[in-house]
Amino acid sequence: MNKVDKEKIQHAVREILEAIGEDPDREGLIETPNRVARMYEEIFSGLSEEPRDHLKVLFADEKHEELVLVKDIPFYSCCEHHLVPFFGKAHIAYLPKGGRLTGLSKLARVIDTLAKRPQLQERITKNAADIIMEELQPYGVLVVVEAEHMCMTMRGVKKPGSKTVTSAVRGIFEKDIASRAEAMSLITMK
């Protein structure tokens, strides 16, 4: 797994400050390279974790085979194209098979681990669905992610408040429209 090289980050941040015409030794900026290095170590900590490891503990003795939904999971990530934040909520629904349940917090941890790396929203959505499908082997998985991207808010098109919504469906949710509709209605229910 990756280890953050804080010294390299500090050097690079100093160079960026100089490249934009700033004095990295002035008051207010002198500690910025160190602060940015510590911040990157934190916000990219998912690079040193395997998201599927969070799903290794199962409650296989349970006989629950009805829909499980964890919704409004807050997350933040960093767009790999511009290295600016995007943030929002993830919703995960799965239909357990054979009583293979995981702790609810484990689903949130999968999202956190995927989000804490240079990332694309589409990849978080797809990878979360694939990992849950592979590890829990449910009848189906549905993942919906909605986020605001600072690369659309702060620069370029400058559309603050716009949201991007992505979804990934696996298993029964691909074919059974009623099951998919039930999960989606529960996600949108206030």
Swiss-Prot record:
Annotated positions binding Zn(2+): 79, 82, 151
Principal EC category: hydrolase
GO molecular function annotations of the record: GTP binding; GTP cyclohydrolase I activity; zinc ion binding
A Pfam family matched in the record: GTP_cyclohydroI
GO biological process: one-carbon metabolic process; tetrahydrobiopterin biosynthetic process; tetrahydrofolate biosynthetic process
Pathway(s): Cofactor biosynthesis; 7,8-dihydroneopterin triphosphate biosynthesis; 7,8-dihydroneopterin triphosphate from GTP: step 1/1
Gene Ontology, cellular component aspect: cytoplasm
Family statement: Belongs to the GTP cyclohydrolase I family.
Assembly description: Toroid-shaped homodecamer, composed of two pentamers of five dimers.
Record-given protein name: GTP cyclohydrolase 1
Organism encoding this protein: Clostridioides difficile (strain 630)
Lineage: Bacteria, Bacillati, Bacillota, Clostridia, Peptostreptococcales
